Amino acid sequence: MSSSQLEQAITDLINLFHKYSGSDDTIEKEDLLRLMKDNFPNFLGACEKRGRDYLSNIFEKQDKNKDRKIDFSEFLSLLADIATDYHNHSHGAQLCSGGNQ
């Protein structure tokens, strides 16, 4: 049985997380920054044009339990923030315009 488009998208997100996570299934700060630079160049470029350094505190903001690692649920929270920004962009807002960042 083939996966639906949304099921495939979720599988792709899991694979992306695993690409940057370590053997303990968490992402460390340097790897999160690399993930962001590798996978969100347009978003980060929009932030830069607006004078916002999105990466400067993203790790600390997303590390909810303060263990200095990003687990999968914290990763999903980060993606939700970015997806919300893209959703707002679809309604005319500029990328990286605030909100959950």
From Swiss-Prot:
Classification via CDD domains: S-100 (cd00213)
Any one GO cellular component localisation term in the record: cytoplasm
Annotated keywords: Acetylation, Allergen, Calcium, Cytoplasm, Metal-binding, Repeat, Secreted, Zinc
EF-hand domain location: 8-42, 50-85
SUPFAM superfamilies reported for this sequence: EF-hand (SSF47473)
Disulfide bond positions: none
Iron-sulfur as UniProt keyword: no
Subcellular location: Cytoplasm; Secreted
Assembly information from the UniProt record: Interacts with RANBP9.
Name the UniProt record assigns to this protein: Protein S100-A7
Taxonomic placement: Eukaryota, Metazoa, Chordata, Craniata, Vertebrata
